[in-house]
């Protein structure tokens, strides 16, 4: 159990690579907080993982990753409940399969808000606790 009692936040953890990462981290003993675009998606993923790891500490949250204040508040709550974040996995992201000349500014903003601003916001929020402790891993 290489990650025993480590606190990991995994963005985009309700499906795909993020879900598989949460599964692996739980198997290694980590306490996992996964984020999803909706609370319902987060809770569904948590339920599935709890079936496999009934004694694990796992939670789902759905902050607006494009909002630093929303991310900070969610991370503060998680830190108060589970401890300082040891590992942040920046996995959330979106893409659009739209021809460039049909790409709208709104679509561009949506992609940039999650794929760039979201990574900045989650990294900034996690780093606050990590820097104070002098340790942590951000992926």
Model regions: which residues?
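Substrate-binding pocket helix/loop in short-chain dehydrogenase/reductase
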Residues: 99-100, 107-112
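A short, exposed helix-loop element centered on a Lys and neighboring polar residues
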Residues: 123-124
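A glycine-rich helix->loop->beta "capping" turn
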Residues: 53-57, 76-88, 96
């Amino acid at each position: 159990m290489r990650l025993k009692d480590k606190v990991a936040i995994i963005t985009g953890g309700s499906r795909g690579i993020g879900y598989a990462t949460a599964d692996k981290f739980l198997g290694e003993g980590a306490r996992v907080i996964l984020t999803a675009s909706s609370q319902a998606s987060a809770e569904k993923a948590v339920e599935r993982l709890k079936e496999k790891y009934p004694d694990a500490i796992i939670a789902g949250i759905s902050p607006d990753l494009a909002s630093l204040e929303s991310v900070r508040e969610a991370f503060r709550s998680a830190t108060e409940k589970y401890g300082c974040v040891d590992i942040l996995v920046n996995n959330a992201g979106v893409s659009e399969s739209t021809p460039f000349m049909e790409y709208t500014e709104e679509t561009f903003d949506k992609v940039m808000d999650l794929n760039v601003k979201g990574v900045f916001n989650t990294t900034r929020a996690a780093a606050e606790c990590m820097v104070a402790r002098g340790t942590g891993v951000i992926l």
